[in-house]
Amino acid sequence: MDSPLAIIVLAAGKGTRMKSDLHKVLHPIAGRPMLMHLMASAAELSPARQVVVAGHGREQLEKALGGSADIAVQDPQLGTAHAVQQAQGALSGFEGDVLILYGDVPFVRASTMRAMIERLHGADEPAAVVLGFAPADTLQYGRVIADDGRIVKMVEHKDASEAERACRVCNSGLMAVRSADLFGLLARVGNDNAQGEYYLPDVVNIAIADGRTCAVVVTDDADEVAGINSRGELAEAEGRWQQRRRAAAMADGASLIAPETVWFAWDTVLGRDVTIEPNVFFGPGVTVGDNVTIHAFSHLEGASLAQGVEVGPYARLRPGARLEEKVKVGNFVEVKNAVLHKGAKANHLTYLGDADVGAGANIGAGTITCNYDGYFKHRTVIGERAFIGSNSALIAPVRIGADAIVAAGSAVSRDVADGELRMVRAEQLVKPGWADRFHDAMKKKKAEKKS
């Protein structure tokens, strides 16, 4: 494809069925707004221009896009053809191909987009290329009546004859058109219909009436053009995405003990021979090395796990957690913005926040890095091979030296030197026989109350 490409994404709908203050196309699937799934696929075609047509929630879209696309505004919303017209200003001076997509149809593959553009440059030079699909139930969809891939006409279901309804190729709404043709055709679209709106498929019928060829490309996967208009459809889309990602993970060498209970993010990276037990959740930003085991009920986000790491069960890795080779983070351990160097262990009931844990260090059960003073975060540094006894509080900023030992139950607020033992406890009080006398006195008092 030598011709420059522009992408128009229609996202002006109110999304009323979502019943949400968040713009419909910004609802996440696998931890990523559905619009950004679509934009990422489109980016594989290296478009020269990108325009998102917004209406309701424009400010949210601008923030999410961060300047990566121009924003055109459709107000009022008068149909899909009218929406595309609003991009004309943003495409002023552009000469090339235009691909029209929908923000609530997020899983169109780059290969499908590419096939549409390639068909636009076919020998018969079609004026427009429509993406068709064959759903299991064609009842609600307009039909693409075609002969050998050339469109005869586009017809809405309610207007179709019985013979036309027998056609299984339906209109996805996606279209590829040359910029030289697009806006001239749009200007001729009327609104003589029950809704009084301007519909994009009419572009095809107008071009055909002019004697131009229009073509259809039919996807082999109806799910890729499934629209999302409600919370239920959002959940279904999430389920389909997760099912495919799980299958891909296992095909790439990961073992998922109960695949249907594992939830991945859009950018999860897994190495070879990774074992994932049931009910594990990956948020965005997780990279897992080879030969890692993640035990049941663990929650990971923004974390990197090197080769041979073992996590969980019931562990939580938060953003900034970095576990180097052979690290063990066990049950009910939380790690945030902390590095555990090679072979370090925190096996149970521990919080490590804003910490640097040296290679081979052992963190006992119940250890807490006290990293927040109510205003600022502070860092704890634990040296190589240090041993932190159970139920210890390390009050940051503090440094524990290499090979040092912190006795169980200590609250450490000053640095500990290399090889030092630090014990910070109140002196034990011993009173022989006191408990016996206490019990005797209480029993006597209880008996007196009953009498």
From Swiss-Prot:
Question: Which segments carry the region annotation N-acetyltransferase?
Answer: 253-451
Q: What is the enzyme's class at the highest EC level? A: transferase
Pathway of action: Nucleotide-sugar biosynthesis; UDP-N-acetyl-alpha-D-glucosamine biosynthesis; N-acetyl-alpha-D-glucosamine 1-phosphate from alpha-D-glucosamine 6-phosphate (route II): step 2/2; Nucleotide-sugar biosynthesis; UDP-N-acetyl-alpha-D-glucosamine biosynthesis; UDP-N-acetyl-alpha-D-glucosamine from N-acetyl-alpha-D-glucosamine 1-phosphate: step 1/1; Bacterial outer membrane biogenesis; LPS lipid A biosynthesis
What's the Enzyme Commission number for this chain? 2.7.7.23, 2.3.1.157
Catalyses which reaction(s): alpha-D-glucosamine 1-phosphate + acetyl-CoA = N-acetyl-alpha-D-glucosamine 1-phosphate + CoA + H(+); N-acetyl-alpha-D-glucosamine 1-phosphate + UTP + H(+) = UDP-N-acetyl-alpha-D-glucosamine + diphosphate
Q: Which HAMAP family match?
A: GlmU
Q: Mind telling me what this protein is named?
A: Bifunctional protein GlmU
Q: Which organism is it from?
A: Novosphingobium aromaticivorans (strain ATCC 700278 / DSM 12444 / CCUG 56034 / CIP 105152 / NBRC 16084 / F199)
Q: Which gene carries the instructions for this protein? A: glmU
